[in-house]
């Protein structure tokens, strides 16, 4: 259904990940790379922005494992041209500019903001696995 509204989506899927998605994945003992491919039934490229890495660095010792995970070469590191932007703002702006991304998040506020951007699939951690959110009814009627 997303592909009818967003023709730029297609395998290999690029998934923008936020800090809490990475942290929830670790807490639920999910291998991000394998679990994304199992969920989407296709090759997936997890993407991390500089803002997300900076946010993990600011969170300190508690998030050191998540920070170490982002250094994995299988993650695509996306550079940010702005300074001091909140990571959620960075993700929303990037998705609005480039409709080729899916977004992995468990942040309720970020999900609410992203639902306003047509054709952007959301992935979240639920019941020890990843789940793709259904397309909203207002988009389905377009």
Where are these regions (language model features)?
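Nuclease catalytic cores that cleave nucleic-acid phosphodiester bonds
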Residues: 47-142
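Domain-level signal for Mg2+-assisted phosphodiester chemistry and nucleotide/NA-binding surfaces
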Residues: 1-75
